């Protein structure tokens, strides 16, 4: 009887040891499996994180390039307007009208016309590449820049600054006197705007249409950031027209047209070289 009890106890002890060993083996396998699953989840999270990081880096690079393109277009259009509009026909129109009419009205009319012209020119510059390939538009812009640059340098070399300035002022005065008798246009729109505002707007708009600054604005907008070109050109027109209205003909007479033409010619030639050696992608 005692032997049977001992045998039974021994079997129970062996069963307990076997169960404990099996449990220990299961516990060792579970952490490994859990580790594998955790590693897989970690790998997936790492890949997702790396993908998001690369995407954010790409977005940051794109934003950086867009910012540089905006600044480049802004500076190019601003400098182009400053060197081409000072002493130009629109500059003299604003200066002469400000001598006889309220400066604020003349300034608002001239700036309104120039802003409208800038928007139209920038829009044309963005439409043209959709009709013509960027390669051809860039080539045309290069030729236009070179043409205007050489033309300005030729004007600076051949013209007498005082004589040419006096002649241009006389031509503008003749246009202003010729427009005094045409009151039908003023009467029609007098309910909406004052006659002085309309006169300043119409004369500035017609003088700017087809001018070298308008063509240069169109050329800039074909291969540079349109917003930067529009903002830079608008700021340049605002500065030049404000100087014309405040200073009048005194400011225009003190600025050497030969110097302005030389600076403008060199700037346009610089644009031409930049467009030729660094074409848009």
From Swiss-Prot:
Alphabetized UniProt keyword annotations: Membrane, Signal, Transmembrane, Transmembrane helix
Subcellular localization(s) per the UniProt record: Membrane
Listed transmembrane segments: 66-86, 105-125, 137-157, 188-208, 226-246, 258-278
UniProt topology in membrane: Multi-pass membrane protein
GO CC term, one of those recorded: Golgi apparatus
Region forming the signal peptide: 1-22
Biological processes, Gene Ontology terms: Golgi calcium ion homeostasis; Golgi calcium ion transport
One GO molecular-function entry: calcium ion transmembrane transporter activity
Family recorded in the similarity comment: Belongs to the GDT1 family.
Protein name: GDT1-like protein 4
UniProt source species: Oryza sativa subsp. indica
